[in-house]
Amino acid sequence: SLTRYDDILAAYKDVRNFSSALGVSLYFGQPQPDRSGMGRTMILTDPPRHAKIRQVVSRRFTPRAVAAYEGRIRQIAADVIDSIAEQGGCDFVVDIAARLPTAAICEMMGIEREHWDLMFTIANQTVGRLDDEYAMGRSGRETMLDAQAQASEFFVKEAEKRRRNPTDDLISILVHGEAGDEPLTDAEVIANCWLLMLGGQETTRNAISGAMLALAQHPAERERFLVNPSAPAAIEEFLRWTSPVTHIMRTAMSDMRIRGETIRTGDRVVLWNAAANRDEARFDHPDTFDITRAPNEHLAFGYGEHFCLGAHLARLEMKVMFEELVRRVSDIEIAGPIERLRSNFVAGIKHMPVRFVSNALPEPKPVSAA
């Protein structure tokens, strides 16, 4: 395990000696046979193949492209909040934090509204494979494989629709895209559809939920935040503080020594993002939640070749959601026990009851999110 910021940063940069191809999480010790029909996602590939797959969809996630989505993202956030604002309270995770990113990525992928609940369920079972609520008596491996099988069945059908009738959504871009000078394989298309659907939901959902909890637990910072909920520094501190993806795993491709410890070829090396983001050698007072922290070069989105493709989208969704919450809800407080996700990979909250008082607003608009 690597826990120091500088060591983790160096490993992220060194794609020659630290491979992603043999797994990126601690869920399973060794790669397992795949019964889902999926190929390799871009996060399970090394250069040069990784960059070739990534460039197929990357233009939809540039800062300029993401900025063009802001109006729609803001409308979704407003609809979500308006739909529950008069209820007096809700499960913040399920009713608010999850609905914006689920709706946004599904719309970008061209997934019809009737299937959004399925996408939410598949995401929960994938990241919550070790959690009893989502495993429902199955082993973690079986829960994961069942989720993959559901996703594969769905995206095979969606990909076939795009082959017959190309569109402008992300699924169609993958179906008709070329990685370098050759098309993606059918299995790669399905795998990367699943990855976009999963990644598009989880990081933002957990960052929004974790940020809301942090604001509730730190009243002074909450008051500062309410004065300027659009401050970029606050979003970066939310990400550092919550570290939604706790670790990323790599496989050593050569013998090496790090801080006096020997790492052999084939050893699994775990990069603990959450520890790096609290490293006192990098951050002043790292255990202090400070929404004005600067600089704040956290590793919540990783670094280098595998830097999170959706980082700009996640930041925008967080910014818009909190701006709309501040505008539409005058007060929010935790109203009951918080249930955390059982996972060593995702720092997630499953359920967080809150109570709130709504600001006076026009009649709610029709709900357009999951």
Give each language-model segment a name.
Residues 1-370:
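Cytochrome P450
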